[in-house]
C-alpha cells in the first residue's frame, strides 16, 4: 500500500474528491426535488422522473465548469512554473490534465444520458395529461393556467389530439431545441476523440472538437424558458400542498386552499460556467496574440526515417527542458495547431522541433519546407509558421531529482534530446549547482535509421563525460526492437569492434526489449535511499508497465528508494 501511495496516492485522492462532489450534488438535488414541499405538485405530475432529471443536471453544471480548465494550457503552465505554490507532487497532477479532461467528459456523457432519458419520461407525462390520457389528478393540475390570472404547472399549454403532436411541441421549445443540439454536439465530440480517430484522422478530431462553442452556448440558454416549475414561496404561505393535495376539487372554493401559483426555476447553468468560459476566452486571446508574433525558420534539416528538424527563432521566446509548443502552418491549414516537443536546449540561441511525417498535415509541412526536393530551399521560400507556447510538461522536473530514468520509444525520444543537450551545456559551462547526479537513459526503436539523428548528441555527451572523468554520469541503453535475419548476421560479425555498428557509440546496441523488472531492481540496489524520477515519452502499454514497476519496486519505508513515475501528455 505504501508503494502504491508514493505514485498514485495524491491522484486517487483528487479523483475521490471529484467523485465525492458528484455524489454529493446528485444526492442533494435528488432529495431536494423528491422531498421538498414546493415540488409536491410537480412530483404529482411527473413522478420520480423529476428528481432523476434535476439531480444529473446539477452534476452536469459542475462537470461542465471543470471540463475547460484542464485545457487552459497557459494557466496550467503558469501554475506549473509557480514553484511557490506548486510542489513536485502538485505539478505531477497538473501533468495529468488531459486524463482528467477525459474523465470529466465521460462523467458529462453519463449524466447527459440520465438527464435526457428522465426528461423524455417527463415530456410523456406532460403530454399525456393534455390529451386526457392520464389520471384525473394530473389532468386537473395541467388545467391550471388555462383561466385568466392563473399560473401554469404543465409546460404543454395547448390541448393536443394525439401524443405525437405533444412531442412536436416539446422539441420545438427552447429547452428541446438546445437539448437536441448540445446532445448531438456531445456525441460528435466524444466519438471523434477515440484514439483511432485522433491518430489517423487528426483533422476530424480537431475540427469536431470546436463544436464545444455551440455546446456551451446551448448549455447556457438551455434553462432560460424555465419549463420545470414549482409552487411559489408566496403561494406556499396561503396554500399548504400537504393539506390541500387531496381536495383538488375544492381549490379556489375554500379559504385555506386557493388556486396554487407556480413559477419556473431561474437558469443556473450560466453561473457555473461563466468563470471557466472567461478563463478559456483569455486563453484563446493569449494564443491568438502569440500566433501573430513573427517566427523565423533559420534551418530545416532532413533526417532519416522521414523525420525533419525545424530550427526557429522568435523574439522573447524562453523555454525550459522538456517543454512543448503548438505549431500552425497557414500554408498547410489556417486553423490547425499541432503539438511538438522542443528538442533544443534552453542554452541555445534557437528552438527546434523534430517532426515525423505520419499524416496529411505533417506531409503538407514536409512539402511546404521543400524537403521533397533534392536542391536546397531558399530561406524566403520557407513557409510562415505560428508558434504558441512553450508549455510545461513532466520532463521539466528532471533536474529536481538526483537520479532519473529516461525512457523514450521511437520519436518519443525528443523531450530527452532537450534534457541531454542541456546537461551537456551545463557541463561545458562548469555548472556547480546541478542536483542531477546520474542518468539512466533507455531508447527503444524499431528501425536502425531512427538512431542516426540522435547518435551525434550521445557521442558528444559520451566524450564530454570521459574528458571530465565522470563517465558514470550517463548510462544509456539503446534497444533495437525490430530486425531481420540478415541484419542479425551483420551485427554478429561486427560485435567485437570497439564502437557499435549502428550508432558509432562505445555502448553497444541491445536487441529486443528491456527486462524492466531486472532494470528496476538493479537501479534500486544502487540507490537504496533515493527518490528516482522515471520519465517516459512513449505508448500507453509501456506506460502501464513502467508505472507498475515504479509501484512494485518502491519501498514502503519513507527513507527507502522511491520510483516516481512521470509521463508526457499533450
Curated annotation (Swiss-Prot):
Domain FAD-binding FR-type: 287-397
Cofactor: FAD
A single Gene Ontology CC term: plasma membrane
Pfam families assigned: FAD_binding_8, Ferric_reduct, NAD_binding_6
EC number annotated for this UniProt entry: 1.6.3.-
Cell compartments where the protein resides: Cell membrane
Extracellular side: 37-46, 131-163, 223-267
Any Gene Ontology biological process: inflammatory response
Changes after translation: Glycosylated. Phosphorylated on Ser and Thr residues by PKC during neutrophils activation. Phosphorylation enhances the NADPH oxidase activity and stimulates its interaction with RAC2, NCF2/p67-phox, and NCF1/p47-phox.
UniProt-annotated binding residues for heme b 2: 115, 222, 226-227, 268
Residues spanning the membrane: 10-36, 47-72, 96-130, 164-194, 204-222, 268-285
Entry GO MF terms: FAD binding; metal ion binding; NADPH binding; superoxide-generating NAD(P)H oxidase activity; superoxide-generating NADPH oxidase activity
Residues carrying sugar: 132, 149, 247
Keyword NADP: yes
Alphabetic keyword roster: Cell membrane, Electron transport, FAD, Flavoprotein, Glycoprotein, Heme, Ion channel, Ion transport, Iron, Isopeptide bond, Membrane, Metal-binding, NADP, Oxidoreductase, Phosphoprotein, Transmembrane, Transmembrane helix, Transport, Ubl conjugation, Voltage-gated channel
Record's subunit section: Component of the phagocyte NADPH oxidase core complex/cytochrome b558 complex, composed of CYBB (heavy chain (beta)) and CYBA (light chain (alpha)). Component of the phagocyte NADPH oxidase complex composed of an obligatory core heterodimer formed by the membrane proteins CYBA and CYBB and the cytosolic regulatory subunits NCF1/p47-phox, NCF2/p67-phox, NCF4/p40-phox and the small GTPase RAC1 or RAC2. Interacts with NCF1 (phosphorylated form). Interacts with NCF2; the interaction is enhanced in the presence of GBP7. Interacts with RAC2. Interacts with RAC1.
Protein name according to UniProt: NADPH oxidase 2
Native species: Sus scrofa (Pig)
Phylogenetic lineage: Eukaryota, Metazoa, Chordata, Craniata, Vertebrata
Amino acid at each position: 500500500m505504501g508503494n502504491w501511495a508514493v505514485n498514485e496516492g495524491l491522484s486517487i485522492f483528487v479523483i475521490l474528491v471529484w467523485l465525492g462532489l458528484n455524489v454529493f450534488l446528485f444526492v442533494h438535488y435528488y432529495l431536494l426535488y423528491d422531498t421538498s414541499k414546493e415540488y409536491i405538485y410537480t412530483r404529482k405530475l411527473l413522478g420520480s422522473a423529476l428528481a432523476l432529471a434535476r439531480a444529473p443536471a446539477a452534476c452536469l453544471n459542475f462537470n461542465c465548469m471543470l471540463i475547460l480548465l484542464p485545457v487552459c494550457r497557459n494557466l496550467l503552465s503558469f501554475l506549473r512554473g509557480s514553484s511557490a505554490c506548486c510542489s513536485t507532487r502538485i505539478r505531477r497532477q497538473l501533468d495529468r490534465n488531459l486524463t482528467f479532461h477525459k474523465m470529466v467528459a465521460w462523467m458529462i456523457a453519463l449524466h447527459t444520458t440520465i438527464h435526457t432519458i428522465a426528461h423524455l419520461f417527463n415530456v410523456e407525462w406532460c403530454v399525456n395529461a393534455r390529451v386526457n390520457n392520464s389520471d384525473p389528478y394530473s389532468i386537473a393540475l395541467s388545467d391550471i393556467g388555462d383561466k385568466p390570472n392563473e399560473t401554469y404547472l404543465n409546460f404543454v399549454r395547448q390541448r393536443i389530439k394525439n401524443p405525437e403532436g405533444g412531442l412536436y411541441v416539446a422539441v420545438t421549445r427552447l429547452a428541446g431545441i438546445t437539448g437536441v443540439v448540445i446532445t448531438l454536439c456531445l456525441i460528435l465530440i466524444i466519438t471523434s476523440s477515440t484514439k483511432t480517430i485522433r491518430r489517423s484522422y487528426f483533422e476530424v478530431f480537431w475540427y469536431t472538437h470546436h463544436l464545444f462553442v455551440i455546446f456551451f452556448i446551448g448549455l447556457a440558454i438551455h434553462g432560460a424558458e424555465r419549463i420545470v416549475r414549482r409552487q411559489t414561496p408566496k403561494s406556499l404561505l396561503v396554500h399548504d400542498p400537504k393539506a390541500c393535495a387531496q381536495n383538488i376539487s375544492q381549490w379556489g372554493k375554500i379559504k385555506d386552499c386557493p388556486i396554487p401559483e407556480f413559477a419556473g426555476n431561474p437558469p443556473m447553468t450560466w453561473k457555473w460556467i461563466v468563470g471557466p468560459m472567461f478563463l478559456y476566452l483569455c486563453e484563446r486571446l493569449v494564443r491568438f496574440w502569440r500566433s501573430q508574433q513573427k517566427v523565423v525558420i533559420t534551418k530545416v534539416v532532413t533526417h532519416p526515417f522521414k523525420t525533419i528538424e525545424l530550427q526557429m527563432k522568435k523574439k522573447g521566446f524562453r523555454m525550459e527542458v522538456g517543454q512543448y509548443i503548438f505549431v500552425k502552418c497557414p500554408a498547410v491549414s489556417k486553423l490547425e495547431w499541432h503539438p511538438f516537443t522542443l528538442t533544443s536546449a534552453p542554452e541555445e540561441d534557437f528552438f527546434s522541433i523534430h517532426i515525423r511525417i505520419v499524416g496529411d498535415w505533417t506531409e503538407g509541412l514536409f512539402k511546404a519546407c521543400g524537403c521533397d526536393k533534392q536542391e536546397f530551399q531558399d530561406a524566403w521560400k520557407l513557409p510562415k509558421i505560428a508558434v504558441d507556447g512553450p508549455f510545461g510538461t513532466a520532463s521539466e522536473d528532471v533536474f529536481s531529482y538526483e537520479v532519473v530514468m529516461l525512457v523514450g520509444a521511437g520519436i518519443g525520444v525528443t523531450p530527452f534530446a532537450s534534457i541531454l543537450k542541456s546537461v551537456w551545456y551545463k557541463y561545458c559551462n562548469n555548472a556547480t549547482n546541478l542536483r542531477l547526479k546520474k542518468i539512466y537513459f533507455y531508447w527503444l526503436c524499431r528501425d536502425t535509421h531512427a538512431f542516426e539523428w540522435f547518435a551525434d548528441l550521445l557521442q558528444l555527451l559520451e566524450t564530454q563525460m570521459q574528458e571530465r572523468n565522470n563517465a558514470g554520469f550517463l548510462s544509456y541503453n539503446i534497444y533495437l526492437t525490430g530486425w531481420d535475419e540478415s541484419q542479425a548476421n551483420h551485427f554478429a560479425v561486427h560485435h567485437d569492434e570497439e564502437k557499435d555498428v549502428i550508432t558509432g557509440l562505445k555502448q553497444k546496441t541491445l536487441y529486443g526489449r528491456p527486462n524492466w523488472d531486472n532494470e528496476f531492481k538493479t537501479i534500486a540496489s544502487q540507490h537504496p535511499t533515493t527518490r528516482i524520477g522515471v520519465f517516459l515519452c512513449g505508448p500507453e502499454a509501456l506506460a502501464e508497465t513502467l508505472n507498475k514497476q515504479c509501484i512494485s519496486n518502491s519501498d514502503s519505508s519513507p527513507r527507502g528508494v522511491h520510483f516516481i513515475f512521470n509521463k508526457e501528455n499533450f
